[in-house]
């Protein structure tokens, strides 16, 4: 989860609660889980690539769909896409993104929506203007972290 609220407010709440001798381990654990999700997502993408295409992340072309922190907005504050892009690049992937609401992100420009040009399409933010059935049809492998492909039956689609 991203945005200005959920990733940051639990840490403030935990800090404030400790001033009053309240235990905050559950709040801190929730923050840790949220912070570690990009690592888990990278692992799911790697598995999808290995099993779906018999290909590793290194040298693969990955298209991130949506970099805003939530659907149908242009705000990228604390977006999980930022860390995920970094992790994929570190693994050797060539990463691009398409977001109808975000023209520039992390030194990149939003590319044309051409799923067939990539080894894997990763749905990070489920913007309602995107045709997910068409994307699945044209893509090699789709990893859907937002359940945007619900109701679409395809062996190409990997979900959490």
Which role does the model predict for each range below?
Residues 1-160:
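Structural/interface elements that position substrates and couple domains in central-metabolism enzymes
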């Amino acid at each position: 989860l991203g945005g200005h609220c959920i990733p940051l407010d639990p840490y403030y709440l935990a800090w404030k609660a400790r001033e009053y001798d309240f235990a905050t381990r559950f709040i801190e654990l929730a923050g840790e889980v949220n912070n570690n999700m990009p690592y888990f997502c990278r692992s799911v993408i790697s598995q999808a690539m290995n099993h779906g295409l018999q290909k590793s992340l290194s040298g693969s072309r990955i298209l991130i769909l949506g970099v805003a922190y939530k659907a149908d907005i242009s705000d990228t504050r604390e977006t999980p896409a930022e860390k995920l892009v970094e992790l994929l690049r570190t693994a050797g992937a060539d990463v691009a993104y398409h977001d109808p609401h975000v023209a520039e992100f992390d030194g990149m420009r939003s590319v044309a929506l051409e799923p067939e040009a990539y080894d894997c399409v990763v749905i990070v933010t489920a913007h309602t203007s995107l045709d997910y059935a068409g994307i699945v049809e044209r893509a090699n492998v789709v990893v859907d972290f937002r359940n945007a492909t619900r109701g679409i039956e395809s062996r190409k689609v990997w979900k959490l």
